C-alpha cells in the first residue's frame, strides 16, 4: 500500500530527518542532528532583516522519510519607492527515486504558504514550470556577458560541435573549428585584443580622476549605505544592497571566497564589484577553461566612469589568477553598452527571474530590463 505524502514546514523537531536527507543528497555527508540544529539556529540569528527569525524551510515526507526539501533566503525588494520584506526561494532538492511525480509541485506549493513577496532564479526547466503553474511570473532569462582574457586558449578548447547544437550557425561553428589551429588562434587573439583596446579607449577617458582598490574586505558601512542610496534612486526594481546585506552576504561565513574592487571619486565610494574564483575546475561544460565571475556590481549613477574602472580592476584580478575569462550576469539594460565597450560579449542567459507578488501590491516591474539583478542575488553565483 502506498505511503501517504505530507508536505509541511520543517523545524528543529525534524533535525534527524533533515540530517539524513542532507547525507543522502551529498550536501553534507557528515550531517548530524546537532549540526542541523546549529544550522537552523545560526540562520535565524544571522538574519539581517529580522534577527532571530528563521526563513521558511519546507519538506515532503513519504511516510516518515523526508524525500524533498526547499529552502528560502530572507531579502528585501525595492520597487523604486520603498523596500519590502521578501524571500528568495532556493535549493530545490528531491531524492532521485521520487522525482517525476507530484512531490515537486507539493513542495513549492507548501513554500508559497509561508512566504508572501518572493522571487527565485532557477536555471532548470522543471522548477521554472512549477513556479509558473503556481502563479509566479517568469520575467525571462538574465543576460550573460563574457570577457575573454586568454583568447587563443579559449579558441583552441571550445567545443564547436556543442556550439552548433546550441544554435550557433554552421558557418560560425566551422570558423571556430579552424580557429583551433594554433597559428590561427594566436593571430585571432592579437586581432581581438587590438579591437577590444580600441573599444575601451573612450571608457578609459571617462574614468580619469577615479581610483580603484582591490581588497579582501568590504568598505565601511557608511560608504556602502551611501552608495546603495544613490544606486537605488534610478532603479525601479532590485534586491537590497545595503551595508548590512552586503556584509551578511559576502563576508559572514564566506571564508575569503570573494574579492572586492571599490571605485572612489576622491573620498566618495562610487562603485563596488564583487569577484569570485570558480568553484570547480572539472565542469565538463567548460572544456577545462577557468572562468571567474563578477557576481555583483553596484554603481553610482552620477559617475559613468565607475563601471569601466571596476571592470579594469576585475580584469587585472582575473589575469593575476590565470583565468581564461570573466563572467558577469546582468539584467539592467542601461549597462549593456558600457559592458560591450569594456570588451564583454553578450550571451544568452540560463538563469531566469521568477517573481511572486500577491495582488501586485508591491508594484515591482514586470520588465526584466528595468531590474538590477546579478548572480549574487539568490546565491546564484555558480555556472
Regions found by a protein language model. Give the residues of each.
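A general structural signal for short secondary-structure junctions and capping/turn motifs
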Residues: 50, 109-112, 252-253, 317-319
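Conserved acetyl-CoA-binding loop-helix of GNAT-fold acetyltransferases
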Residues: 94-113, 304-316
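Charge-rich interaction segments
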Residues: 172-233
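A conserved beta-strand-loop-helix scaffold within acyl/acetyltransferase catalytic domains
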Residues: 5-92, 210-297
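Short, amphipathic alpha-helical segments
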Residues: 83, 101-105, 121-125
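Mid-sequence acidic-hydrophobic segments that form the walls
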Residues: 73, 92-95, 110-124, 133-134
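Active-site/acyl-donor-binding loops of N-acyltransferases
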Residues: 2, 117-198, 249-252, 259, ...
Amino acid at each position: 500500500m502506498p505511503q501517504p505524502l505530507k508536505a509541511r514546514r520543517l523545524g528543529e523537531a525534524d533535525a534527524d530527518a533533515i540530517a539524513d536527507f542532507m547525507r543522502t543528497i551529498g550536501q553534507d555527508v557528515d550531517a548530524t542532528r546537532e549540526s542541523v540544529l546549529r544550522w537552523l539556529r545560526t540562520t535565524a540569528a544571522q538574519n539581517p532583516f529580522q534577527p532571530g527569525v528563521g526563513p521558511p524551510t519546507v519538506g515532503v515526507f513519504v511516510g516518515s522519510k523526508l524525500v524533498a526539501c526547499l529552502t528560502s533566503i530572507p531579502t528585501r525588494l525595492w520597487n523604486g519607492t520603498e523596500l519590502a520584506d521578501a524571500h528568495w526561494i532556493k535549493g530545490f532538492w528531491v531524492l532521485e527515486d521520487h522525482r517525476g511525480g507530484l512531490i515537486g509541485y507539493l513542495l513549492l506549493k507548501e513554500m508559497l504558504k509561508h512566504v508572501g513577496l518572493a522571487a527565485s532564479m532557477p536555471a532548470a526547466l522543471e522548477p521554472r514550470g512549477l513556479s509558473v503553474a503556481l502563479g509566479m511570473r517568469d520575467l525571462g532569462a538574465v543576460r550573460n556577458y563574457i570577457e575573454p582574457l586568454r583568447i587563443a586558449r579559449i579558441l583552441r578548447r571550445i567545443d564547436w560541435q556543442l556550439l552548433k547544437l546550441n544554435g550557433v550557425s554552421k558557418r560560425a561553428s566551422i570558423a571556430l573549428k579552424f580557429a583551433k589551429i594554433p597559428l590561427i588562434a594566436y593571430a585571432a587573439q592579437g586581432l581581438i585584443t587590438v579591437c577590444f583596446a580600441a573599444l575601451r579607449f573612450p571608457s578609459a577617458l571617462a574614468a580619469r580622476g577615479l581610483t580603484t582598490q582591490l581588497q579582501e574586505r568590504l568598505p565601511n558601512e557608511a560608504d556602502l549605505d551611501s552608495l546603495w542610496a544613490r544606486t537605488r534612486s534610478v532603479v525601479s526594481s532590485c534586491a537590497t544592497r545595503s551595508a548590512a546585506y552586503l556584509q551578511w552576504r559576502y563576508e559572514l561565513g564566506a571564508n575569503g571566497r570573494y574579492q572586492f574592487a571599490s571605485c572612489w571619486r576622491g573620498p566618495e565610494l562610487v562603485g563596488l564589484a564583487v569577484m569570485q574564483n570558480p568553484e570547480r575546475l572539472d565542469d565538463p561544460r567548460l572544456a577545462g577553461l577557468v572562468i571567474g565571475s563578477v557576481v555583483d556590481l553596484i554603481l553610482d549613477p552620477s559617475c559613468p566612469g565607475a563601471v569601466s574602472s571596476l571592470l579594469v580592476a576585475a580584469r587585472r584580478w582575473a589575469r593575476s589568477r590565470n583565468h581564461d575569462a570573466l563572467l558577469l550576469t546582468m539584467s539592467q539594460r542601461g549597462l549593456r553598452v558600457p559592458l560591450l565597450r569594456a570588451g564583454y560579449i553578450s550571451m544568452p542567459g540560463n538563469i531566469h527571474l521568477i517573481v511572486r507578488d500577491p495582488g501586485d501590491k508591491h508594484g515591482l516591474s514586470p520588465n526584466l530590463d528595468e531590474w538590477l539583478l546579478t548572480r549574487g542575488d539568490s546565491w546564484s553565483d555558480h555556472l
